[in-house]
C-alpha cells in the first residue's frame, strides 16, 4: 500500500477510484437487487434499505473529512536557527517535536504521523486519525451488510440449483451478482485487515512508523553490541545504546481518548465529531506527549539509528567542498572557465582509462557475485521490517532527519562543516533580527 504513494498515475486517480468503488458497490448493487426480477428473495426490505443507505451516507461524510482535514502543521512564534537537544528537520529548517515526522508528500512535519495514505492523498496524523478510523469502521459495516445481501441471493440460487435454468436468475443478472461479490470480497478482506491494524494502533497508542521503529530497535538489541560498537557521536564519544520500552502507551482508555481528542466515548464514533488540533502556543497538544515512565528518563524515543549515526560521522559530502576554489572560479571569464572544465574532463578520462586497465589485469573480475552486490545495495537503502517496509514506504522523508546531537554547537569549529549557503542564511537572519530590534 505504501509504495503506491510513488506512482503518479495512482496518486491522481486515488480519490476518484475510491469514489467509483463506493458507487459501484453501494448503488449498483441496490439497482441489481431492486430491478432484477429473477433474483430471489427480491428487493431488500424498507428497513434494510434505510439502514444500508444510512451507512453509505455516513461513509461519504467520514471519507470526505479524512481527505479534506488538514494533517496539521507546526507554527513557531519566533524564527529558530538551531535547537539544542531537540530533533531537527533539515527540510523545514525548524525543530521537530516528538512523534512528528517530515512527510515527503505533504512537504511538512506532520504531528503524530502514522503514514501517508495513497487512497486519501492525505496523512493519517494526530488531526486526521479520528476521521480515518470512523471511515474504516463505517466502510466495513457497509461491506458486511452488502455481504449479507449477497449471501441471501446466493443461498437461494444454491437452494434452487436442481430447477431448470430458465427458472433461475438471468445470465446478465448472475454475471453482475458474481462481479459485485468478487469485488466486495476483496475489498472486505483488504479493509478488514486495515481496520484491525488501525484499531491496534489506536489501542496501543503506537503509529505504524513507531511500530517500525520498535521492531528495528528490538532487532538491533537482539543482535547485541556487535552492531553498534564502532559508532561514535558528534562529540567523539561512543553512543550509548540501551533497550527502550515504548513510552507513549499510557493505558487502554487514555490511549484511545488521546487519539480521538475527547474522553466522551459517544463522540468517538459520531461522524460529525471533531478532531485534535495542534496547540498554537508551541506547548501542549501536538508539541508534548505524556510518557509512561518505563524508561530511565523521558524523551529517549525514537531509539538511535546506527545507520544514520554512521552517515553523520562520515559527514555531508558538501562539507568537503573547496569553497575557496569555487569563489576563485566565480571570478573567471567564460573562456578561462571553459578551459578549466576541459582540463578536468581530460583528467577524468585519464583516470578512467587507468582504472579500466587495472580491472583488466584481474583474472576473476567476471566472477563477481551479483547477488552479493544486490544484497549490499538493498542494505544500503536502510533497514526493513518483517513486512519488507522501509521508513520511506510510510511517507517519511528520511533525508529531513538528523541524529540527535548533529546540530549541537559545542565547539566553534563546528561551523567548518556547515554549508556556505546555510552560513549565509543564518547571517541574514541575524542581521534582520538586529534591524528589527
Swiss-Prot record:
It comes from the Eukaryota. It catalyses: L-cysteinyl-[protein] + hexadecanoyl-CoA = S-hexadecanoyl-L-cysteinyl-[protein] + CoA. Residues 34-48, 152-173 are lumenal. The DHHC domain is required for palmitoyltransferase activity. Residues 1-12, 70-130, 195-437 are cytoplasmic. Residues 396-419 have a biased composition (Acidic residues). InterPro entries: Palmitoyltrfase_DHHC, PFA4, PFA4/ZDH16/20/ERF2-like. PANTHER family: PALMITOYLTRANSFERASE ZDHHC16. It is a multi-pass membrane protein. This is Palmitoyltransferase PFA4. The active site is at 117 (s-palmitoyl cysteine intermediate). HAMAP family: DHHC_PAT_PFA4. The chain crosses the membrane at residues 13-33, 49-69, 131-151, 174-194. GO terms for molecular function: protein-cysteine S-palmitoyltransferase activity. It comes from Gibberella zeae (strain ATCC MYA-4620 / CBS 123657 / FGSC 9075 / NRRL 31084 / PH-1). Residues 87-137 form the DHHC domain. Its EC number is 2.3.1.225. Residues 377-419 are annotated as: Disordered. Belongs to the DHHC palmitoyltransferase family. PFA4 subfamily. The lineage of its organism: Eukaryota, Fungi, Dikarya, Ascomycota, Pezizomycotina. One of its GO terms (cellular component) is endoplasmic reticulum membrane. Mediates the reversible addition of palmitate to target proteins, thereby regulating their membrane association and biological function. Pfam families: DHHC.
